[in-house]
């Protein structure tokens, strides 16, 4: 069954007022950004950190996730965050989706690069795989486009300092290669490419499957 995004929301705040539609078992993925400071964004209780890194000395991004226990989960407060993307992601029966590998890049240019992922990170035994890209450009006049193969899911801007976008591709069957997009004005950016993997829950389909969260075969670039 294909990994799919059930819903997404964006808010210029440290918490989400209206969560995207979700149900028990869905992966809730939060992409949090602190603009104007390299102070780390702090995760709320119950969320697991997947990645965190400064954007030069003028920003900080944090990726966190949890699995919904009901259809009425809340975001909690992501301390120091100025902007949040929240995604609800589903998979097939008796499976879970987990965030596997992140490649990341940064620079100051009109060319924004989404760094390649490596052969060792591609889970050939997975039921399904998908990709999520996220980029922050510190010039609010720039127009962001989706990297090749992905579709824009949600965008945000504070209309003064930055613009941000998250994109998605379902049913990914090949390793992500280094890919560029261009913007009109040279600006500091931070880009991420996150692979999502679907795997059977142990014991749900006769055993097998990949290692589930807490011991997954993932990593960073």
Per-range role (PLM):
Residues 1-220:
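Primarily extracytoplasmic/secreted proteins
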